[in-house]
């Protein structure tokens, strides 16, 4: 049902998504839907939270599996994963659709705010892992850096490809480097 809902959102948008169509696509009854979710909004928040939790868990595992104290190697591995994630625009589109839905629907906005707060905490934990592991001295607290990383990712997703800009993964790693007080790499000459 989650996969069918996700596909519906990406194809039609949140406003056009119907529980009946989701259930039909998933091969379930509407009763099955309501035995798992109180409303369409609950489903929407669940979809986004579960994806972000899975992704942050994967990123934290990547950090934990990196050997040694070479932050550059760790950032390179994280950038590789972020580049792969950027190739899956449906997740960024989903997040943007939900943000727009929250802006238009006050009842959903509160649930969405709670869901985003959980996501920010998860990103903050990832940043805290890096700070501890490499004894970094960040410019902002870990959760605030996580909020900034998430906002930057979403903003870049909305922008799409920008002529002359570096890739999303390079931009995120550059932002993290700046926030972590790491040496900033010289910008490439055009």
Q: What are these model-derived regions, one by one?
A:
Residues 56-57, 61, 87-96, 106-133, ...:
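Amphipathic alpha-helical packing segments from all-alpha helical-bundle domains
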Residues 108-110, 130-182, 186-190:
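Hydrophobic/aromatic-rich alpha-helical bundle segments in the mid-to-C-terminal region
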Residues 4-42, 46:
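Helix-turn-helix
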Residues 38-42, 46, 53, 86-90, ...:
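Residues in soluble alpha-helical coiled-coils and helical-bundle/repeat scaffolds
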Residues 46, 60-91, 142-149:
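Hydrophobic alpha-helical connector segments
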Residues 1-6, 22, 47-51, 55, ...:
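Generic hydrophobic, amphipathic alpha-helix propensity
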Residues 80-86, 94-104, 178:
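Helix-loop "lid/cap" segments that line or gate small-molecule binding pockets
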Residues 4-12, 58-62, 94-98, 152-159:
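Solvent-exposed, amphipathic alpha-helical segments
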């Amino acid at each position: 049902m989650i996969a069918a809902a996700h596909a519906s959102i990406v194809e039609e948008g949140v406003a056009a998504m119907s529980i009946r169509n989701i259930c039909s696509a998933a091969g379930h009854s509407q009763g099955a839907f309501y035995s798992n979710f109180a409303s369409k909004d609950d489903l929407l928040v669940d979809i986004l939270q579960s994806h972000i939790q899975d992704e942050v868990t994967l990123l934290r595992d990547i950090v934990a599996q990196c050997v040694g104290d070479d932050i550059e190697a760790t950032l390179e591995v994280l950038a590789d994963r972020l580049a792969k994630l950027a190739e899956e625009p449906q997740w960024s589109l989903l997040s943007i659709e939900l943000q727009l839905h929250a802006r238009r629907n006050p009842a959903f906005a509160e649930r969405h705010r709670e869901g985003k707060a959980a996501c920010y905490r998860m990103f903050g934990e990832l940043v805290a892992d890096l700070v501890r592991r490499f004894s970094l001295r960040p410019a902002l607290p870990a959760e605030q850096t996580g909020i900034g990383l998430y906002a930057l990712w979403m903003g870049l997703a909305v922008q799409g490809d920008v002529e002359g800009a570096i890739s999303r993964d390079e931009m995120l790693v550059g932002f993290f480097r700046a926030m972590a007080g790491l040496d900033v790499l010289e910008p490439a000459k055009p």
